[in-house]
Amino acid sequence: MCLRKGETKMQDKNINSQGPKDFKNALKRFWLSIREWKIKIIVAAVLSLISTLLMVFGPMILGMMTTSATESLKNQSVINWSEINFLAFVLIATFLLSAVIGYIQGVVTSSLSVLYEKKLRNSILEKMRRLPIGYFDKTPNGDVMSRMINDVDMISVSFAETLTQIITSFTTLVGYLVIMLYLSVTLSLIAIFAVPISTIFISSVLKKAKVYFAAERTTLGKLNSIIEENFSGQLIIKANNHAEKSIKGFDKINDQLYNESRQAQFLSSLTFPLTHVFLNLAYAGVCMLGGYYVISGVISIGGIQAFIQYLNRFNRPITEVAQLSSTIQQILAAAERIFNFLEEVEEKPEVEKSLFKQIMNKDRKFLGEVEFRNVNFSYDVKPIIKNFSVKIKPGMQVAIVGPTGAGKTTIVNLLMRFFDPNEGEILIDGVETSKMRRDEVRDLFGMVLQDTWLFSGTIMENLKYGAKRVSDEEVYKAAKLVGVDHFIKSLPNGYQTVISEDSDNISAGEKQLMTITRAVISEPLMMILDEATSNVDTRTEQLIQDAFSKLTKGRTSFVIAHRLSTIREADLILVMREGNIIEQGNHKELLAKNGFYAELYNSQFSEDV
């Protein structure tokens, strides 16, 4: 969980709406991502090739059986059953062997598909860990979820089938063509003539379909974002009578997805009938000329039977190849979205040699002195923090106040290294945080956020989240210290009570008390409290304040609060406006100045009265 800026989350403007911009590059990146399994791919390809070739000879063997029988009848002799039985045995053996090899090939490609799916999901999750928080501020959650779920599923489901189908279709097509040319060059030319004509028509159709398929994937990501936001924000939607407007917004995107899907499927579905029309014309021509050739003795009846079977099946691999084109486009469109995500700019690399040990040396005590030295920070091009400097002594409780957008939360984001300053330095016990690893800096702090995050699981599991080797007894002790132990024990299953997915079976105040308990358990060296009492009742607020006072005792701590009554006991209050510290001092000193802080405090006091 991390702190967010106050800015509104922006829509991702870089989502590709036209499919793979560079087909060759997308294909190259796709190959580079799967080449670690090239041995499996080669094995699957060889097995598919053998299985297909065995099936290709089926009509030829049937033709030989027909020729043997008709020649015997033509010569008014006894049918050579031994030859026919032998050919029948060869035919059955061929089909069985092809089926067994095909099964083995299917197992290999399925395992390859599962491995690749696992790799993609792991890569996306690892990438998320390395991305700066700013990326998630600008990118809708649903879009990232769409890449991890929908796009990965598209590749996983289609990849194995497509790999097999490509090999099978091309092998079948080439095998049929070679045997057809062997049986009759003239008849083969009639069949082949239909291919380029149908290809021209189909290519133009698929070119248009590609655009709709890519747009469909993009719109699906937007729809996921809307669904996720509507689902998690139902309480706010209903409280503000916003349901009808939300439905209209959903319907608009849903209709857009419907139209794009309909257009994509309509154009994609044209490939089969178009191919069928041209190949059926060729089929009619072959039947007419083939009949003449049989009568003329140019080709045997078994030969023309085999040729017609090949021709009858000839359209299948061509149709499959045509349909594969659209499937490949979908795969590459999904793959490109994933690869683009994996190539997003990451956080700056960690320092090779961390200076963390300098402040955690066994020979010296950790103090908790924090200094901001001439810090400047801009979010995109908007300046947020301007030449910010302050030195905080060990053990001080520092409150940061100011209007929305003043830069309060950004200060904490910089302190936790969720962002790094554009200029200036942040030091802890005299060591620059930029010269420590991010996880080392974050280990120094315990955080209690306004947006309390509890996952679906037991209360005990939630309280132990992030802690290392904590016993149940330590959890009980921390809960008693915070004052939440009585509440937990009053639940049906106590500490083993399962919190629902949205943790809506406990109140906001109880959630915050639990997050404070979690912080107590982690025994942090310093503390951060971000507006954690701004949406609870007065009694719970007092419980939280008491718990926080115990937690911050002797620790350097930072408090961000809009309710200024909660930070009257702070050692130092920093008053911010437009990224600058305009006032600082304790509560009494700032009131005596009768400045901006006094104005804020008195206005809130008047509202409370």
Per-range role (PLM):
Residues 2-5, 356-609:
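ABC-type nucleotide-binding domain
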Residues 31, 35-39, 133-134, 152-159, ...:
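An intracellular "coupling" helix at the cytosolic face of ABC transporter transmembrane type-1 domains
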Residues 128, 250, 338, 372:
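Conserved catalytic Walker-motif region of ABC-type ATPase nucleotide-binding domains
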